[in-house]
Amino acid sequence: MTHLTRKSEKHYSLDDDGGLEMTKTNSGLWLIGLGPGDLSAMSLAAIDAAKDCEYRYLEGYTALLPENEMSRLNEFVGDFEVSMRPAIENPEQLFELAKKARVALMVVGDPLQATTHVDLQLRASEAGIECHVIHGISITTIVTGAVGLQSYRFGRQVTLAYPYGEYLATSPFELIIENKERKLHTLVLLDLDPTGMGVDEQKPMTPAIAVDVLRKSADKLSINIEDWNIALCSDMGRPEQRIFYGTLDEVANINDGSIHCLVIPGRMDELELKALQRWK
């Protein structure tokens, strides 16, 4: 484990009048959002907070930082280690450090978008550890705006999981159908871990696998989805981001990009339909 000494212990918070005041703290846990994956979108507050921590970890299983950004993060904030699922879900070592030193857990996107990190925040509070949050731009914010659909017309967000052997989880698809029945759009995040264990190197789900999972889920529930048009959003928030709107077959045949998500539209008004069709 890398122990880093910082000469600065300065942090800023809002005073009673809404202005910034400088505070000092020698210990605690910082949940720091890095933004969508292009560190150019990382806030100055996030960089400053991470620099001021003595221990820095990059959470590596709920989201994925592109390989070319790893060295850049090191340049921005200093040395860090990657933490996978066991260290986050069993955070005793993390908490022991946070009781006596400043500890940063850096997360791609916004740190409180995943329930994993909300749970960590609550457990830290129960353990008497002060927990600070530096928010970042989330995939939810980027995608809903970029595709041109109204954010208030989205239903529950789902994550499409890899099949595990013979087992295929249909609950994500059931939520998509529930949203459609309510005339709501669905943001579908794609699984990063074929093992489901959160310990190995991540392997983002491809568009072809995602479409296959949708079709198998539909077959299992005897629902016909072959007339669906969906949006594929790739590498969002990065210079190479791409949006494509088309049929299931068209989406499945796209090989470009590295990290993807889907938007499955519900009922669209005229403006939303026009906005979405520009991505065909």
Identify the meaning behind each predicted range.
Residues 94-100, 146-150, 167-174, 201, ...:
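Short, surface-exposed amphipathic charged segments that create phosphate/polyanion-binding patches used
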Residues 19-20, 46-47, 95, 173-178, ...:
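A generic local secondary-structure boundary/capping motif
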Residues 41, 45, 68, 89, ...:
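Conserved active-site and cofactor/substrate-binding residues in soluble primary-metabolism enzymes
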Residues 109-186:
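Class I SAM-dependent methyltransferase SAM-binding "motif I" and its flanking Rossmann-like core
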Residues 3-6, 11-130, 134:
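Class I S-adenosyl-L-methionine
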Residues 29, 178-280:
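A contiguous loop/helix-start segment that scaffolds small-molecule binding in enzyme catalytic cores
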Residues 41-43, 67-69, 115-117, 143, ...:
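Short glycine-/acidic-enriched loop or helix-start segments at secondary-structure transitions
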